[in-house]
Amino acid sequence: MSRILGLDIGLKRIGVAVSDPFGVTATPLEFILNDEKVFEKINDLIKNYKISKIVIGLPLTLKGEEGEQARYTKEFVENLKNHIPQDIEIIFVDERFTSSLAEKTLLQTKKKNKKEKIDSLSAVFILQTYLDRLSFSNEATNYSY
């Protein structure tokens, strides 16, 4: 079974999460440095986890508009498409508030390196949002009359 990869694109680091094989839960992975080897590392994840889709957080403004970071994310995705298999579907998910949710969650723990963990935890929230929507839409289809 294939899995879904969740990414939170940042200028320095990329938060990473992966779904379970059934597409129910998202689990954080170690962040990736956004450097010259970033596409190679993402390709390794695609191969190792048998990824069929990538869900990427799109950082919209509070008004729902695309700002500078959203434009950077879209540009990153255009470059990513040139480095991954063409059959991998890429989906954007509104990521407003995921970083603040991740920060609040980590404040309740005593983990070290919180800054690095926020990136992958944000990726978990991004991916889990997508998985929950997918599950809800499947349930609605299965229970329609």
Swiss-Prot record:
GO cellular component assignments: cytosol
Keywords of the record: Cytoplasm, Hydrolase, Nuclease, Ribosome biogenesis
Source taxon at top rank: Bacteria
Main location: cytoplasm
Enzyme Commission number(s): 3.1.-.-
GO molecular function: nuclease activity
InterPro entries reported for this sequence: RNaseH-like_sf, YqgF, YqgF/RNaseH-like_dom, YqgF/RNaseH-like_dom_sf
Enzyme class, first EC level, given as a word: hydrolase
Biological process annotations from GO: rRNA 5'-end processing
Location(s), subcellular: Cytoplasm
Family: Belongs to the YqgF nuclease family.
Function as written in the Swiss-Prot or TrEMBL entry: Could be a nuclease involved in processing of the 5'-end of pre-16S rRNA.
Protein name: Putative pre-16S rRNA nuclease
Organism, scientific name: Sulfurihydrogenibium sp. (strain YO3AOP1)
